[in-house]
Structures are given as structure tokens and as C-alpha cells.
């Protein structure tokens, strides 16, 4: 799947989103990470985290398994990096 990935698409992901993606990559596969833990690992504020997660979901680099739930001030309950997200980071990171 990474073969069809355009590096320009990855470069368009802003630095905040890359910071979140890198933080998520430190956790085990399949582990769901809540916004507060992302905040602790990155130092980003909730608004920045929400925007980054939205961008990463659109790029298929992360998933929000239960999109109908959220845990304010975050627009999601938990998030996990996809295998595709890990591959992109490994190759282009």
C-alpha cells in the first residue's frame, strides 16, 4: 500500500499532525490512545490534537474506532495508528 503513497501527500500533513503520528507510533499495535495521553506525550493543546487527528484520519494514517463517542475536550474517545500509518512513518518519517 505504501508503494501507491505519494510523498507529497505526507509532506502536506502539517507538523502538528506528524507530531501526533510519531507519538502514536510509540504505542503497541491495536492500542487505543486517549487525547489526554496524546497531550502528555506531545505537549499539544486539545484544539491542535483534534485538528491533527482529523487530518490523520482523512489521510488513513490513524483510525478512531468509535467515531460516535468523544471525551471532551477532544472530538474523539480514543485513536490508534493504522498499519499504513506505521509504514508511512517508517518509510518517510
Annotate each PLM feature.
Residues 70-75:
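Short, solvent-exposed loop/turn segments that connect beta-strands within catalytic domains
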Residues 1-3, 37, 91:
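Long, compositionally biased intrinsically disordered regions
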Residues 29-41:
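Short acidic, hydrophobic short linear motifs in intrinsically disordered regions
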Residues 22-29:
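Short, locally clustered residues in the helix-turn-helix/winged-helix DNA-binding domain
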Residues 43-59, 76:
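Short amphipathic alpha-helical interaction segments
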Residues 1-21:
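Short alpha-helical segments that sit at the start of domains
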Residues 77-93:
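Short, amphipathic alpha-helical interaction segments positioned at domain boundaries
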Residues 57-69:
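A short, conserved structural fragment
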Amino acid at each position: 500500500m505504501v508503494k501507491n503513497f505519494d510523498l507529497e501527500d505526507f509532506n502536506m500533513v502539517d507538523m502538528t499532525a506528524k507530531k501526533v503520528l510519531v507519538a502514536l507510533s510509540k504505542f503497541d499495535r491495536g492500542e487505543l490512545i486517549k487525547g489526554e495521553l496524546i497531550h502528555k506525550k506531545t505537549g499539544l493543546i486539545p484544539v491542535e490534537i483534534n485538528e491533527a487527528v482529523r487530518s490523520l484520519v482523512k489521510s488513513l494514517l490513524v483510525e478512531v474506532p468509535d467515531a460516535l463517542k468523544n471525551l471532551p475536550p477532544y472530538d474523539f474517545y480514543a485513536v490508534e495508528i493504522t498499519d499504513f500509518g506505521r509504514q508511512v512513518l517508517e518509510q518517510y518519517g
